């Protein structure tokens, strides 16, 4: 009897779409059930302890990881204990392979290309008239650390000053409740240069492509870089961190070993905002190497499916 080509997948903010489409195009089918004896493998975005039941339901079948976020999963450096039974972790770019090796991730890592949006050449701007600011968003349980709230507020204050001077418009694209982003008081000020827009972490890019400058953190910022839109990140020198409460909040353990490689070169919290914005909008030279390492090449669906099938 010919084996059935059925897989189980965890969905996360549409980040699974390219992987799922590649599998479907090669004759695989997604199981509609959490547990099924006919499933050949699982494809998940994370392996933290809260998802133990998901792995138990695999009944020993192989499983793989696709990227939970655009930034490589350096939280495995002391914040989260990785499971050791992952058949392979798929990553978007060379940085994912390098950093997982650097922190001693115990399972195989396979680069399959950037999957979250198209990769486009940089398009310079003369001015930053339209700025999209995407604050660091709270977890699903509404928790956001005090350090991230401070970063959000400081970045916002700097952008407002810049907007006042240059008559720019800042659209604050926030996820979940504004108070959980640490910006409730800022919203109450009703600044004339600021538009507040509640959004969803669904992979949409409209607020990126209509902007002259994007200021953000992690996935939204990485997508802006991929799309060729001038981008500043925020608090890049602060060690990566993880936690769903203050009690469980931790930083990575070996940040000094790889921070120079990982830090995005242009940060809104750098000393001279005017100079940093100008560098961001006029050329991609400062971030070209970073983009090659952290965005890399477009997603290769056949390479991904081949890698799955070779490991079953």
Predicted regions and their residues:
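Active-site and donor-binding regions of nucleotide-sugar-utilizing enzymes
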Residues: 4-119, 221
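Conserved catalytic-core segment of nucleotide-activated headgroup transferases in glycan assembly
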Residues: 16, 117-185
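Short acidic low-complexity segments
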Residues: 27-36, 197-207, 272
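Conserved acidic residues
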Residues: 35-38, 87, 129, 209-213
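Catalytic binding pocket for nucleotide-activated donors in carbohydrate/polymer assembly enzymes
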Residues: 219-296
